[in-house]
């Protein structure tokens, strides 16, 4: 094998090793999560007609990231990530099984939904940060981009294209069935992760007197000092504010001009499907885009094209335009996410990836609800197509913030 062939081989993750099991666990788990997240709002709406209470279920899914996101990253850097992940999935599986029993027996309440959403996301803060930190131990550095692309493509396909359409059929079989399926996927994912054969993580000894609080502060300080990571985190946060504005009002944008009912629902479903399909295709091509342009330029290119898509959606209020724009937007969204995550994994100092990932995720989650509020206010004040233009402005700022890295 020539040197060129060796490098090319190392740039592709080996399915036969631990990566294949991690990929399967991630895809299976996303499938179950998507069943639950599609079914929970329907259950909440059947329990109360108070929109504030229904929205509170979603809010409880965000809150733990703001409260415990950085803590989850610090813990992920301290522990054996593999063990933490399968233990968390077993606990989440047990919680979902208990919740499924409560639904089957007719004991579900809004209070129970709030507690469940908060508990699951609290556990997710540790799981997601540990998963990001574990991946570089399973694949060579040269294969990180391809591995991230395959993970995101599989998750997008399972969650966006497979799970959501199944929910109505599963609910016909019983109100508890989606939650039983979610519990089963957690257990299966835990078994797959537990079967990984990775050595104990090698970390430098912690200084005397080191605490989780000090380690969280150290992670933020490292992010602030690293110029590429700092600007990349800034750009990602701005984009997530824009995404919050777009997604929160997308149904109003798409159904504007349709009568309430099947026509509007079909238009909205077609738009979401186009976005998911674009995201899946983007996963297949994200690494190739980076190979041609460089990783940071791939991120900037993705943001630039997404800005154009948002301007088009806001300026041309036609359903066909929205569907096409969302397909391209989803494509470039995966290109951004794959290369942003890979850059973060490549640049984070050894033993600090969990904390760096936690800072990215915490700021991203904080941006989404802020964007949703801004998007709602824009739609109420200036019409249903204004949030897309607001999102375009935020994406343009994000791309501009990357200019120092490109130059």
Question: What are these language model-derived features?
Answer:
Residues 1-407:
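Alpha-helical transmembrane-bundle signature of multi-pass membrane transport and export proteins
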